[in-house]
């Protein structure tokens, strides 16, 4: 059930909740409480009413409504009343539930509902069957609520003999899920035991509706990928390793789903199952926990809340991570028709259920005692809104019908009070715990709960609050805690643990508040309804979008968490500017993002160094904690490591940088930049990666950029679905097998816009305009390459790489210019940046060295410096470039060629004649002060150096560079010549000029007579020459 539920929760979360409750309560519902179920069953058995309800519920889990009714039925008269009540409630859910029930197998609420509704239409003909009735209830839902109620009652009666009803339900479901429905039928038939059994025999007893996506569920997909089959409207599962495809939920996933369901069922079931189910569930729980003691329910509530919260968060994480918030919201949504029907039905049911509610409330009361639990369903939804959202839907839908109105008010009040408390608590937690570590998970809940939108939404509807939460980047942080993602249960437990703690505290308070709020709840019902309508619409839209994205292979897995963070930040900022986002919420989220980046920075920075951000130069600088020395370049704790990481960072950062530009938030920019860096770093070097590793869960997620860590992207088209077993629909045509794309993202690391040019050390930076830097860079790399010639080994390497570099450098400079490279650029780099080209060419400390040389010393020295640099490059540059490309080449090589010290600027004599010694690093590692530019010649000098360098490079230009330049010229030429204004003469003249320039640049001019100055007596000589031949 949990799995189902989880799925259901993520999938149809809010919308389907309605129907899922029934089904959930039915197979999933009971399953969710499989643990409680047995207890509940036993306990329920003990508690005659509870027991029968539980048993019935368990038995008729599928017919959750009936189950609910059954519980009351068991009580006997309550049974009927309750049944009626249940029907109402159930009707709420029942209609969906009925459908869901048959579809109950599809533990995915909304999706199930969709399937169920479809089924209901199909099954409407089967209305005669009670299962059909339940489905009919669906059909009737649209058609006639009364008839649906009658059907429900009949079904409930049948359920009273639960087994028959369950089987019937089972028969009905088959149409919807492509997978064998019989199992589902069997599960309902199994009765309580079945629910438990179904849990146990997940695939067989417990049936997961393949129409429901696992996307929102916090489960570890492992080698399995969920593939949507348009023909059947169901998901099939594809094992990317074995290429196995199955319509059934693979055992690996089923176990997780069930596990999740265990967590959520209680809350989800309670909430979703229209408090009838809640009643059953809660009854069971209550019975289990305290038979009917409120403390028991409270406990249950807490448990539920925790579970739900955990589950929800896990779900929401996985959901958000896998599908995204939209998907999470969407999944629960039913098709519009269904949604509308549900709404109509819900409204009617709500009116009718007002009475049943009182009856149901008897059960519900216990439930309500647990009520807080049930209300908590809303509250829980609040706290656990992720599942809650679904649950809220169901609660709102079913709960609205019965307890919902009362509980809604109560919940609303409770929610508001609880939320306020939660807010305070969560904020405290957030600020205390949340801000640094799992703040995202907690802050997710706490923030969303406490945060503007969430809280309001929460008060109005816990669901939305959860949604907000789900939407919040927490998903990233949550997802970042891989624990949540990997094992929904673990994640739920891990993340949920924090949440659950908060939620527990909150639940306690909520419980108190809820009781007081119960009264107020009713008033909020209308609001809730409006919210529900809105939710449904949102869900619908989200579902559609999510489905489309999913089909197109667009998902979270293809981007790193930092990218997600960047996008989320940008989106939030945009929303905030529009006035649609609470400023405090935005601030909190930005702080969370900054915290995540901070963690990344901490983990990425070598020991003994601290990483700081220079706002003016928009780049990182590093301070040696012992010496207080600061530098732009990534700490040389191992120069190579530094270079590597730096470079990697540079590469990755440039991407981020570009994105960052879009990002208004400096924090977000930083964060995005850093993140990429770390990702790159990690992928590219073991050393770096180890440094990152500490963040493990979060970082691992962050590193999702790195293909290695990424599971195959959904982009890989799964193999065609297997023929659905026992499922009426013919096997869908196999979707085309997707080419595996999982690692496509990594290429980004190669960014050549790395901004190989680092911002010059503070003060020098502005000297080199970006463009000049770019050109210079190209030239420099050429000259470097040439100078490299002096050092044969490096020469080759450099030459080979230089061309790449020059191009990449140019691009990089552009990127970097706008956004300074973060990590990769070394302090020296900053210096050279002024020199820019040289350092760009190398992109490393050695570059900086050569650059500074060139700048400081003159062209001659430059040449020397360059050669030195190229040497440095030779070993380092090539690797460095490689690292850009591969992110895996350790720059260690570089170190040997040029001692880091040298690179830094101590450079040996060759390095430089004039390079000014790098300014002493600021004594204190205070982050704010940008490190003094090491060896950065004064700006003027730098410029001169650059010019000299440029000249020199002009004399020695690698052929590739020449080619590139000539091509560029030709292109420009074409552009110019294409204009009709230019006449042939001007074009010819231009070409001549260009040729001259090329000759000069390439150094061929020295040997070309056309470039020799004519002697003053050239006319006379010319005459003489002409005369000579004639004579």
Curated annotation (Swiss-Prot):
Listed Pro residues bias regions: 712-741, 913-939
Q: Which residues carry this modification: N6-acetyllysine?
A: 294
Task: Report biased composition (Basic residues) as residue ranges.
Answer: 457-466, 943-955
Under SMART domains, the record lists: WW
Q: Specify the WW domain's residue ranges.
A: 218-252, 603-637
Quote the biased-composition stretches of kind Acidic residues, using this chain's numbering: 400-414, 742-757, 971-984
Indicate where the modification Phosphothreonine is found in the sequence. 176
For region Disordered, the annotated ranges are 1-102, 116-143, 166-205, 355-518, 629-681, 712-813, 900-994
Q: Which Pfam families match?
A: WW
Q: Glycyl lysine isopeptide (Lys-Gly) (interchain with G-Cter in SUMO1) crosslink: positions?
A: 305, 352, 527
Statement: the UniProt record of this protein carries the keyword Metal-binding:
no
Cross-link Glycyl lysine isopeptide (Lys-Gly) (interchain with G-Cter in SUMO2) per UniProt, renumbered positions: 339, 352, 527
Keyword Repeat on entry: yes
The free-text domain remark for this protein reads: These WW domains interact with Arg/Gly-rich-flanked Pro-rich domains found in several WW domain-binding proteins (WBPs). The N-terminal WW domain has the greater ligand-binding ability.
Protein name from the UniProt record: Formin-binding protein 4
Supply the source organism for this entry.
Mus musculus (Mouse)
